[in-house]
Amino acid sequence: MLFRSDDCGFGYKRQGNVELLERMSKEYDFKLIVIPKLELEGEIVSSTRVRRLLSEGRIEEANRLMEDPFMICGPVVHGNHMGAEVLQMPTANQIPAEDKLLPPKGVYVSRIRYKDEIHYGISNVGVKPTIEGKNPVGVETHLLDFAGDLYGKVVTVEFLTRIREERKFSSIEALKEEMQNNIAYARAWFEKNES
């Protein structure tokens, strides 16, 4: 059984189409099911549309088009320990594969899944410009009301909405103040949307 959209193209220069698949299904004895395009909010739902919305930071719009929220999954790695030691806000750091589609650099409201547990938090996608040093693009997540150890554990971070762009602050104190504002925003967002 083969499922394809009604506008599929495949093969050399995308010359293959539904008509070719229909002929091939008779010749090679398989069932072809053609799925019509789905429209939502006046546009066709497609992976191209989802990628465009994600690359523009329009997380909530992209999530409405998918069965599950946009997420990354991977092990928690050691960072420079600035979150716990300097900011008093421990973070779970992940370094996604270079070819992984990520939303634009910035801070996001996030939901974190680990085993059967669900936690809420804020996630920064980017290079942590306020912290000196050359940092790879990563995802750094502060879990609200969580005191466990996730190093080496595989966690899933779901991006729910964008709070702001990543930016360099004039001081660690200014960064800490902004992180508290981000946490307050996230708590209000969860209270409104998750209750």
Residue ranges: model-predicted function:
Residues 13-17, 46, 106:
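Residues at alpha-helix caps and immediate loop-helix transition turns in enzyme cores, especially N-
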Residues 38-39, 43-92:
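Anionic-ligand-binding alpha/beta catalytic cores of soluble enzymes and soluble regulatory domains
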Residues 24, 79-195:
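Phosphate/ribose-recognition catalytic cores of enzymes acting on nucleotide-derived substrates
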Residues 7-12, 39-41:
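Short histidine/acidic/glycine/proline-rich micro-motifs that form metal-
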